[in-house]
C-alpha cells in the first residue's frame, strides 16, 4: 500500500469515528428526553395508583365487566419495541414467545414498534394492530385509540 492509500484510509477511519461520535450524542439526547418524559409521568401514575387503591379499599368489591375474567382463553399483548435493532427488542420477543400462556394460536399482538411486530409475526403471532408509526412521537391520542380497541375486543369476548 502506498503512502497515499494509507492517508486515505486514515482519513476514512477518522471520518467514520466522527460520524459514530455524532450518532452517540444524538442517541444520548433522545434517551435523556425519553427519560424526562417517563420521570415526568411517574408522579401522575403514583397518584392515580393511590387514588384507585383507596377507592377499592373503601368500596369493597366492585363488579364491573372490565374487572371480571373473560369467558375466552384468547389473550392480548401490547409489545413495545423500537423501529430499529437492538437487544431490547429481541428480549421482548423472547419474553412473549417464551411465555407458555401466550401461545401464537391464542394471542393477539398489538405492536408498537416494527422490530417487535416483525419478530412476533415470524414466530406465528397474529398482529392485530400495528402502531409502529407512533413509537418516535407517542401521544395521548395514540394510547386512547389503543385502549378503545382493546376494550372493544374484550367486550366482544375475543380476549379475556
Indicate residue ranges for each PLM-predicted region.
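Conserved loop-to-helix interface motifs that mediate assembly, gating, or partner/ligand docking
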Residues: 1-160
Amino acid at each position: 500500500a502506498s503512502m497515499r492509500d494509507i492517508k486515505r484510509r486514515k482519513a476514512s477511519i477518522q471520518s467514520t469515528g466522527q460520524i459514530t461520535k455524532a450518532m452517540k450524542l444524538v442517541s444520548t439526547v433522545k434517551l435523556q428526553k425519553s427519560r424526562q418524559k417517563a420521570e415526568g409521568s411517574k408522579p401522575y401514575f403514583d397518584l392515580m395508583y393511590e387514588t384507585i387503591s383507596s377507592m377499592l379499599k373503601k368500596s369493597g368489591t366492585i363488579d364491573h365487566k372490565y374487572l371480571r375474567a373473560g369467558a375466552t382463553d384468547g389473550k392480548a399483548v401490547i409489545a413495545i419495541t423500537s423501529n430499529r435493532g437492538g437487544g431490547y427488542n429481541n428480549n421482548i420477543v423472547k419474553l412473549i414467545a417464551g411465555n407458555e400462556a401466550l401461545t401464537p394460536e391464542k394471542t393477539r399482538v398489538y405492536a408498537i414498534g416494527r422490530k417487535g411486530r416483525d419478530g412476533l409475526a415470524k414466530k406465528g403471532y397474529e398482529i392485530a394492530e400495528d402502531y409502529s408509526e407512533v413509537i418516535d412521537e407517542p401521544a395521548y391520542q395514540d394510547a386512547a385509540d389503543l385502549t378503545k380497541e382493546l376494550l372493544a375486543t374484550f367486550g366482544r369476548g375475543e380476549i379475556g
